[in-house]
């Protein structure tokens, strides 16, 4: 039975604490738990009874491994008894890495390994499109826990910000009174398995025990995760374990309890914690059970040398944003998982990830590019899910940067690769917008326009959430076009006319009406859009920004095409008139001007170049080349990394594979970090996953090097040049028919 259970205040953090220990016969699956490590979650080592060790101390340096371009990280398969079979290869069981990427390492590897805990640590989230778990540097730790689309406020009068959640996976583990911490572990190795979405922390605790901790955000249960722990005694030891639910210190209205539920005849004790965010008072509820196949773990058991303890923590986190009764729903998820058992939970999780990987990118001749493509796809699949009308913030569920709001990043950068490789997830992203059309209508009316003006920064409400110190929230109106183009492309990909009529058409119609009311007519019969911020956010309040006008043209034409597809009559002539009259400015030498009066200034990110791709308005190769050559040196060297992806894509389509690869490498140099290929917005920008940049480079692989293009007639494959050392690129699971496309060197 449990030794004690109570609410404990430690270091300003409220915890629901359970203490237990046991020896358990070997049982299928390995397990895990986590101790929070950042300022908002309880540090490892607090709330521990009779344990020693110094949380936060650094482990000894361990030799680093494989290189990707100029950086040095390690890529190797995690050792497993008997090996782990995948669809493409049998994973290595060797303890040490076998080769250097770019040399002898195979290009179809699925695992990334870290053994360096002294350098700056760059983690990546383990997520299921709803629940995001961010492993930390400290052993068995979580830096953050987040739910998508759940927001609090930055302050009493601040805009919304994605909320940090409760942590139902917190764990403290002691062996003979020595706590697991940075200073007490050795021979440590972290592994990220991208094939089946698990994260592992494996280490020795002195000469007493070897510990293996695995983390999964369960794909089949959007609000639940599974931590599995295995402790193998190297000598006779006494094991003590404390499982907790922790809450950020500024959360309010705490309520908790422990309740026993019987699954058939087996008793399980479930701890629960209820808390509210500090500003908006959003209710978050967590539940967790620490268990073996025999039920809740008993306390104070000796492990003999050679014996193994295996246990699991099944946790759930639910908010009232998504479910009306989060307190009971959180418990129901845990009860369901206990009934299923860890074997079935993991099997279903892996089967669903196998389905996701039907949409894959395979590169022959460049193991580094293969790993990066897989890492980018892994994060894209991890941060969104089918059947949930939610979109992806620029940093996904890895961080609270940009308040976790939804920008154009979703439609222009992350959505396109998902549209090609997973229509179900793509549908979730467009449904997020269609369900918030009323808010866009309201915003347009507030500023004196007709139709729909979508917020530049959107949260769960669908209203404008951009801080007022940024002009983008007031003037970056191309967001409405971005939304409309994404919706039209969903119809072009799927041909789902019923969806178009019910969901897509209202948005296309309202965005077209917005642009008709937004333009100003000139004496020469052309029309202009004045006072905007374009994709180049360095240029404020300009007239006839290239991308703004270009995206409006495409959105207006999409509305016309949708009306024709649905046999709807009305405003088509007016939409066509505006689309034909909008100005795209050009110089005498044929270079496209970014806006009226542009004089060669440095630009933040690609703007004019987006007219060729993705807008497909500039199609003449000579014109595309002129704009590339003019604007490439004018893009800020420390601007967002997705610009290089767009430039490289267009060079590949122009037949210059070497040039495309050179720009691709430039785009990765700085933002890409080991050991898990975390991708930051700019060089040195924090331990986050910049989903926007990853989406841009996925488009480079799919639409650039493989040449895929979405048209009104469906998918076509355009000629495209490969980098000189690549043999081929294969993109699988494309479109509703799940086709395979190959571009191979002849």
Residue ranges and their predicted role:
Residues 11-22:
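Bacterial N-terminal signal peptides
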Residues 116-151, 413, 465, 521, ...:
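C-terminal capping/lid segments that line or modulate ligand- or cofactor-binding pockets
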Residues 406-436, 485, 489-493, 502, ...:
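Active-site core of glycosidic bond-cleaving carbohydrate-active enzymes
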Residues 15-16, 47, 51:
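Cysteine-centered motifs
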Residues 368-377, 430-465, 493-550, 568-590, ...:
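Active-site acid/base region of carbohydrate-active enzymes
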Residues 384-398, 424-485, 491, 498-502, ...:
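Helix-terminus loop motifs that line ligand-binding clefts
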Residues 29, 37, 57, 61-71, ...:
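Acidic/polar, glycine-enriched structural segments that form the non-catalytic walls/loops
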Residues 2-13:
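Bacterial N-terminal signal peptides that target proteins for export
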């Amino acid at each position: 039975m449990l030794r004690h259970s109570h609410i404990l205040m430690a270091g300003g953090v409220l915890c629901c604490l359970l203490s237990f220990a046991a020896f358990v016969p070997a049982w299928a699956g390995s397990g895990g738990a986590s101790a929070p490590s950042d300022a908002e979650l309880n540090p490892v080592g607090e709330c521990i009874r009779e344990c020693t060790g110094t949380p936060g101390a650094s482990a000894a340096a361990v030799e680093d491994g494989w290189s990707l371009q100029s950086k040095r990280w390690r890529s190797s398969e995690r050792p497993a008894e008997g090996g782990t079979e995948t669809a493409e290869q049998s994973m290595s069981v060797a303890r040490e890495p076998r080769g250097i990427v770019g040399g002898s390492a195979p290009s179809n590897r699925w695992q990334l390994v870290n053994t360096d805990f002294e350098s700056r640590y760059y983690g990546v989230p383990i997520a299921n499109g709803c629940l995001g778990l961010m492993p930390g540097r400290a052993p068995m730790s979580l830096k953050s826990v987040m739910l998508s689309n759940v927001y609090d406020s930055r302050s009493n009068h601040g805009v919304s910000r994605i909320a940090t959640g409760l942590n139902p996976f917190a764990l403290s583990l002691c062996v003979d009174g020595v706590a697991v911490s940075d200073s007490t572990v050795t021979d440590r190795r972290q592994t990220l398995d991208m094939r089946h979405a698990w994260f592992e922390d494996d280490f020795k605790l002195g000469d007493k025990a070897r510990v293996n901790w695995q983390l999964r955000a369960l794909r089949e249960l959007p609000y639940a995760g599974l931590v599995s722990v295995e402790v193998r005694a190297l000598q006779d030891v006494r094991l003590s374990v404390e499982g907790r639910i922790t809450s950020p210190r500024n959360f309010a209205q705490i309520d908790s309890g422990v309740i026993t539920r019987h699954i058939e005849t087996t008793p399980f004790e479930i701890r629960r914690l209820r808390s509210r965010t500090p500003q908006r008072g959003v209710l978050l509820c967590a539940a967790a059970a620490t268990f073996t196949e025999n039920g809740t773990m008993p306390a104070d058991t000796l492990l003999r040398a050679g014996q193994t303890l295996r246990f699991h923590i099944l946790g759930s986190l639910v908010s009232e944003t998504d479910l009306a009764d989060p307190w009971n729903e959180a418990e129901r998820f845990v009860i369901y998982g206990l009934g299923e058992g860890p074997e079935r939970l993991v099997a279903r999780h892996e089967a669903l990830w196998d389905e996701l990987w039907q949409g894959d990118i395979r590169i022959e001749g460049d193991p580094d590019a293969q790993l990066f493509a897989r890492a980018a796809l892994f994060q894209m699949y991890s941060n969104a899910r089918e059947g949930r009308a939610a979109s992806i913030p620029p940093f996904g569920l890895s961080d609270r940067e940009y308040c976790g709001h939804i920008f154009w990043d979703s439609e222009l950068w992350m959505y396109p690769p998902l549209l090609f490789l997973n229509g179900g997830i793509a549908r979730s992203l467009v449904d997020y917008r269609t369900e918030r059309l009323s808010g866009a209508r309201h915003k347009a009316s507030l500023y004196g326009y007709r139709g729909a003006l979508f917020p530049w920064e959107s949260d769960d409400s669908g209203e404008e959430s951009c801080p007022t110190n940024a002009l983008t929230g007031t003037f970056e109106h191309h967001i409405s076009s971005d939304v409309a183009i994404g919706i039209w492309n969903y119809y072009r990909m799927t041909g789902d006319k019923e969806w178009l009529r019910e969901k897509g058409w209202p948005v296309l119609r309202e965005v077209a009406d917005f642009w008709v009311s937004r333009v100003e007519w000139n004496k020469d019969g052309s029309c202009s859009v004045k006072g905007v911020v374009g994709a180049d956010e360095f240029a404020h309040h300009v007239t006839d920004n290239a991308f703004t006008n270009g995206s409006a043209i495409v959105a207006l034409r999409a509305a016309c095409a949708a009306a024709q597809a649905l046999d709807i009559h009305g405003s088509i002539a007016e939409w066509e008139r505006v689309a034909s009259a909008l100005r795209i400015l050009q110089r005498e030498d044929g270079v496209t001007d970014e806006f009226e009066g542009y004089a060669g200034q440095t630009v933040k990110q690609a703007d004019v170049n987006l007219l060729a791709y993705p807008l497909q308005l500039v199609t003449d190769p000579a014109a595309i080349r002129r704009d590339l050559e003019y604007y490439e040196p004018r893009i800020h060297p420390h601007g967002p990394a997705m610009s290089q992806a767009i430039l490289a894509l267009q060079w590949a389509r122009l037949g210059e594979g070497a040039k495309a690869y050179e720009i691709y490498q430039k785009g990765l140099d700085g933002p890409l970090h080991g050991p898990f290929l975390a991708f930051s917005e700019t060089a040195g920008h924090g331990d986050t996953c910049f989903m926007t940049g990853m989406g841009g480079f996925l488009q480079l692989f799919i639409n650039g090097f493989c040449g895929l293009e979405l048209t009104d007639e469906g998918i076509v494959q355009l000629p495209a040049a490969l980098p000189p050392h690549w043999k081929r690129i294969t993109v699988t699971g494309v479109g509703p028919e799940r086709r395979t496309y190959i571009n191979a060197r002849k």
